Amino acid sequence: MEARSKPQFLAFLILFSVLFSQSLAWPLFGPPSVVRLDDRMPFEGAGDPDQVSLKADSDILQNPLAENGTPYYDVSRNARHADGVFTSDYSRLLGQISAKKYLESLIGKRISSSISEDPVPIKRHSDAVFTDNYTRLRKQMAVKKYLNSILNGKRSSEGDSADFLEELEK
């Protein structure tokens, strides 16, 4: 039993040390930088009044919490983050739209969004379907008419059979 507990204890110790070292590197526990707090960077050659304000700001930098005890959040950083999220989502949407258009052009079924585009492939297909259905209907009606004439005892003459063959060929 002791042989099994030593590797488990060692694994637990390694995991704990990794997590603890990562938590020390976490920015909330360290002092925030001047760039994150004010979006101001001290430039070289700053005058005496700026040095005094920089000393006053250094007290703020030591405490990452505001006076009321809540963490300090930079509004401009949140705005930049929101802009980045919007830009990435918008780019993804544009990519999906362009992929859809490309796929439609490959298939040959472009969706016409304006009157100027000519939906010829779709129209040709619908015309062919209509013509096929209409031809089938005419043949069925000709067969029905011929069978009715035979069943009713009317014999067709030479002229009627020629009309029947013409109707079947149409």
UniProtKB/Swiss-Prot annotation:
* Any one of the GO BP annotations: regulation of protein localization
Q: Name one GO cellular component term.
A: extracellular region
What keywords would UniProt list here?
Answer: Amidation, Cleavage on pair of basic residues, Glycoprotein, Hormone, Phosphoprotein, Secreted, Signal
Signal in keyword set: yes
At which residues is Asparagine amide found? 152
Residues with PTM Phosphoserine? 76
- Gene Ontology MF, one: neuropeptide hormone activity
Propeptide at which positions?
22-79, 156-170
Family annotation (InterPro entries)? Glucagon_GIP_secretin_VIP (IPR000532), VIP/GHRH-like (IPR046963)
State the signal peptide span. Answer: 1-21
Per the record, residues carrying Isoleucine amide are 107
Task: Please give the residues the UniProt entry marks as glycosylated.
Answer: 133
Q: Where in the cell is it found?
A: Secreted
Protein purpose: PHM-27 and PHV-42 are two bioactive forms from proteolysis of the same precursor protein, that cause vasodilation. PHM-27 is a potent agonist of the calcitonin receptor CALCR, with similar efficacy as calcitonin.
Record family assignment: Belongs to the glucagon family.
- Give the protein's recorded name: VIP peptides
Phylogenetic classification of the source organism = Eukaryota, Metazoa, Chordata, Craniata, Vertebrata
